[in-house]
Protein backbone atom coordinates (compact mmCIF):
# COMPACT_ATOMS: atom_id res chain seq x y z
CA UNK A 1 0.00 0.00 0.00
CA UNK A 2 1.03 3.64 -0.45
CA UNK A 3 0.98 4.18 3.31
CA UNK A 4 3.40 1.30 3.87
CA UNK A 5 5.73 2.59 1.15
CA UNK A 6 5.46 6.06 2.74
CA UNK A 7 6.56 4.73 6.13
CA UNK A 8 9.44 2.80 4.61
CA UNK A 9 10.60 5.73 2.50
CA UNK A 10 10.57 7.92 5.61
CA UNK A 11 12.89 5.36 7.20
CA UNK A 12 15.13 5.38 4.13
CA UNK A 13 15.15 9.18 4.18
CA UNK A 14 16.25 9.14 7.82
CA UNK A 15 19.08 6.71 7.06
CA UNK A 16 20.27 8.65 4.00
CA UNK A 17 20.29 11.92 5.95
CA UNK A 18 23.54 10.84 7.58
CA UNK A 19 22.42 11.84 11.08
CA UNK A 20 22.22 9.32 13.95
CA UNK A 21 18.82 7.66 13.87
CA UNK A 22 16.87 4.88 15.58
CA UNK A 23 14.83 2.65 13.27
CA UNK A 24 12.24 0.18 14.59
CA UNK A 25 11.41 -2.64 12.19
CA UNK A 26 10.61 -6.34 12.07
CA UNK A 27 12.78 -9.14 10.74
CA UNK A 28 10.54 -9.46 7.69
CA UNK A 29 11.17 -5.75 7.08
CA UNK A 30 14.70 -6.84 6.15
CA UNK A 31 13.43 -9.60 3.85
CA UNK A 32 11.95 -7.37 1.14
CA UNK A 33 14.02 -6.46 -1.92
CA UNK A 34 14.75 -2.73 -2.16
CA UNK A 35 16.72 -0.74 -4.68
CA UNK A 36 20.36 -0.22 -3.60
CA UNK A 37 20.95 2.82 -1.40
CA UNK A 38 23.09 4.46 -4.07
CA UNK A 39 20.30 4.08 -6.61
CA UNK A 40 17.75 5.72 -4.32
CA UNK A 41 20.17 8.59 -3.68
CA UNK A 42 20.60 9.09 -7.43
CA UNK A 43 16.84 9.32 -7.91
CA UNK A 44 16.23 11.87 -5.14
CA UNK A 45 15.15 15.16 -6.74
CA UNK A 46 16.34 18.41 -5.17
CA UNK A 47 14.65 21.58 -6.37
CA UNK A 48 15.64 25.10 -5.34
CA UNK A 49 14.41 28.57 -6.13
CA UNK A 50 16.02 29.70 -9.40
CA UNK A 51 16.70 26.09 -10.46
CA UNK A 52 16.54 25.67 -14.23
CA UNK A 53 14.24 22.76 -15.11
CA UNK A 54 12.00 21.79 -17.99
CA UNK A 55 8.53 21.12 -16.61
CA UNK A 56 7.74 18.29 -19.02
CA UNK A 57 11.03 16.54 -18.20
CA UNK A 58 10.33 17.01 -14.51
CA UNK A 59 6.92 15.37 -14.89
CA UNK A 60 8.53 12.42 -16.69
CA UNK A 61 11.12 12.00 -13.92
CA UNK A 62 8.40 12.02 -11.27
CA UNK A 63 6.52 9.28 -13.13
CA UNK A 64 9.73 7.24 -13.37
CA UNK A 65 10.17 7.30 -9.57
CA UNK A 66 6.62 6.22 -8.82
CA UNK A 67 4.50 9.37 -8.62
CA UNK A 68 1.02 9.25 -10.14
CA UNK A 69 -0.07 12.10 -12.40
CA UNK A 70 -3.53 13.39 -11.51
CA UNK A 71 -5.75 16.32 -12.47
CA UNK A 72 -5.46 17.60 -8.89
CA UNK A 73 -3.23 16.49 -6.03
CA UNK A 74 -5.22 14.87 -3.24
CA UNK A 75 -2.75 12.61 -1.44
CA UNK A 76 0.90 11.56 -1.01
CA UNK A 77 2.57 10.11 -4.09
CA UNK A 78 0.66 12.29 -6.57
CA UNK A 79 1.53 15.24 -8.81
CA UNK A 80 -0.36 17.52 -11.19
CA UNK A 81 0.66 20.01 -13.87
CA UNK A 82 -1.39 23.12 -14.70
CA UNK A 83 0.21 25.58 -17.06
CA UNK A 84 3.49 26.62 -15.47
CA UNK A 85 2.61 25.16 -12.07
CA UNK A 86 3.71 21.81 -10.68
CA UNK A 87 1.87 20.49 -7.62
CA UNK A 88 3.44 17.50 -5.92
CA UNK A 89 2.80 15.67 -2.68
CA UNK A 90 6.19 14.18 -1.72
CA UNK A 91 5.83 10.84 0.01
CA UNK A 92 7.97 11.95 2.95
CA UNK A 93 6.45 15.40 3.53
CA UNK A 94 3.54 16.52 5.71
CA UNK A 95 2.10 18.89 3.09
CA UNK A 96 2.03 19.01 -0.71
CA UNK A 97 4.23 21.54 -2.50
CA UNK A 98 3.41 23.99 -5.30
CA UNK A 99 6.27 24.90 -7.61
CA UNK A 100 5.70 27.82 -9.99
CA UNK A 101 7.85 28.20 -13.08
CA UNK A 102 8.82 31.27 -15.07
CA UNK A 103 9.77 29.68 -18.34
CA UNK A 104 12.26 26.98 -17.37
CA UNK A 105 13.21 28.63 -14.08
CA UNK A 106 11.71 27.85 -10.68
CA UNK A 107 10.09 31.09 -9.52
CA UNK A 108 8.63 29.99 -6.17
CA UNK A 109 8.20 26.95 -3.93
CA UNK A 110 5.57 26.76 -1.21
CA UNK A 111 3.51 24.26 0.72
CA UNK A 112 -0.27 24.34 0.42
CA UNK A 113 -3.40 22.85 1.94
CA UNK A 114 -5.01 20.02 -0.04
CA UNK A 115 -8.58 20.99 0.85
CA UNK A 116 -8.47 24.78 0.47
CA UNK A 117 -5.56 24.87 -2.03
CA UNK A 118 -4.27 27.89 -0.10
CA UNK A 119 -0.56 28.47 0.43
CA UNK A 120 0.91 27.68 3.84
CA UNK A 121 4.62 28.50 3.81
CA UNK A 122 7.25 29.67 1.35
CA UNK A 123 10.29 27.44 0.89
CA UNK A 124 13.70 27.92 -0.67
CA UNK A 125 14.10 24.27 -1.66
CA UNK A 126 12.40 20.87 -1.57
CA UNK A 127 13.83 17.36 -1.63
CA UNK A 128 11.63 14.74 -3.29
CA UNK A 129 12.22 11.07 -2.53
CA UNK A 130 10.90 8.28 -4.81
CA UNK A 131 7.33 7.10 -4.26
CA UNK A 132 8.29 3.46 -4.81
CA UNK A 133 10.91 1.28 -3.15
CA UNK A 134 12.02 -0.17 -6.48
CA UNK A 135 12.14 2.54 -9.19
CA UNK A 136 12.08 1.62 -12.86
CA UNK A 137 15.30 0.27 -14.31
CA UNK A 138 16.53 -1.57 -11.23
CA UNK A 139 17.53 -5.19 -11.72
CA UNK A 140 19.04 -6.31 -8.41
CA UNK A 141 17.60 -5.73 -4.96
CA UNK A 142 19.21 -5.44 -1.55
CA UNK A 143 17.92 -5.76 1.99
CA UNK A 144 17.10 -2.66 4.05
CA UNK A 145 19.79 -3.96 6.41
CA UNK A 146 22.35 -3.28 3.67
CA UNK A 147 21.59 0.44 4.01
CA UNK A 148 23.32 0.47 7.40
CA UNK A 149 27.07 0.73 7.92
CA UNK A 150 28.49 -2.20 9.89
CA UNK A 151 30.92 0.14 11.64
CA UNK A 152 28.27 2.58 12.88
CA UNK A 153 25.28 0.32 13.56
CA UNK A 154 24.12 -1.65 16.59
CA UNK A 155 21.14 -3.99 16.23
CA UNK A 156 18.88 -4.57 19.23
CA UNK A 157 16.96 -7.83 18.80
CA UNK A 158 13.86 -8.20 20.96
CA UNK A 159 13.14 -11.91 21.56
CA UNK A 160 15.27 -13.26 18.67
CA UNK A 161 13.58 -16.67 18.75
CA UNK A 162 10.19 -15.11 18.11
CA UNK A 163 11.64 -12.81 15.47
CA UNK A 164 13.01 -15.79 13.57
CA UNK A 165 9.77 -17.76 13.94
CA UNK A 166 7.77 -14.85 12.54
CA UNK A 167 10.21 -14.45 9.67
CA UNK A 168 9.95 -18.14 8.84
CA UNK A 169 6.15 -17.95 8.86
CA UNK A 170 6.26 -14.94 6.53
CA UNK A 171 8.62 -16.80 4.20
CA UNK A 172 6.39 -19.89 4.09
CA UNK A 173 3.27 -17.80 3.42
CA UNK A 174 5.07 -15.84 0.71
CA UNK A 175 6.32 -18.94 -1.08
CA UNK A 176 2.86 -20.51 -0.92
CA UNK A 177 1.29 -17.37 -2.38
CA UNK A 178 3.89 -17.26 -5.16
CA UNK A 179 3.22 -20.92 -5.95
CA UNK A 180 -0.50 -20.20 -6.34
CA UNK A 181 0.19 -17.19 -8.56
CA UNK A 182 2.39 -19.30 -10.82
CA UNK A 183 -0.31 -21.95 -11.00
CA UNK A 184 -2.74 -19.22 -12.10
CA UNK A 185 -0.44 -18.09 -14.91
CA UNK A 186 1.14 -14.97 -13.39
CA UNK A 187 4.74 -14.09 -14.24
CA UNK A 188 7.01 -13.44 -11.25
CA UNK A 189 10.16 -12.02 -12.78
CA UNK A 190 10.10 -8.61 -11.06
CA UNK A 191 12.77 -8.11 -8.42
CA UNK A 192 10.27 -6.54 -6.02
CA UNK A 193 8.23 -9.77 -6.18
CA UNK A 194 10.98 -11.57 -4.29
CA UNK A 195 12.10 -11.77 -0.67
CA UNK A 196 15.34 -12.78 0.99
CA UNK A 197 15.20 -16.11 2.87
CA UNK A 198 15.33 -15.81 6.65
CA UNK A 199 18.61 -17.74 6.66
CA UNK A 200 20.23 -15.08 4.45
CA UNK A 201 19.04 -12.27 6.72
CA UNK A 202 20.41 -14.04 9.79
CA UNK A 203 23.79 -14.36 8.09
CA UNK A 204 23.74 -10.61 7.44
CA UNK A 205 22.75 -9.88 11.05
CA UNK A 206 25.69 -11.94 12.27
CA UNK A 207 28.06 -9.51 10.52
CA UNK A 208 26.76 -6.58 12.63
CA UNK A 209 27.23 -5.74 16.30
CA UNK A 210 24.01 -6.75 18.01
CA UNK A 211 22.41 -7.13 21.43
CA UNK A 212 19.66 -9.69 22.00
CA UNK A 213 16.94 -9.53 24.65
CA UNK A 214 15.89 -13.05 25.65
CA UNK A 215 13.08 -13.85 28.10
CA UNK A 216 13.97 -17.54 28.47
CA UNK A 217 15.73 -19.43 25.70
CA UNK A 218 19.23 -18.10 24.98
CA UNK A 219 19.75 -20.14 21.83
CA UNK A 220 18.47 -19.15 18.42
CA UNK A 221 19.24 -21.22 15.36
CA UNK A 222 21.01 -19.12 12.74
CA UNK A 223 22.14 -16.39 15.13
CA UNK A 224 25.51 -16.29 16.79
CA UNK A 225 24.91 -15.72 20.52
CA UNK A 226 27.70 -14.75 22.90
CA UNK A 227 26.89 -14.31 26.59
Where are these regions (language model features)?
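ASCE RecA-like P-loop NTPase motor cores
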Residues: 1-227
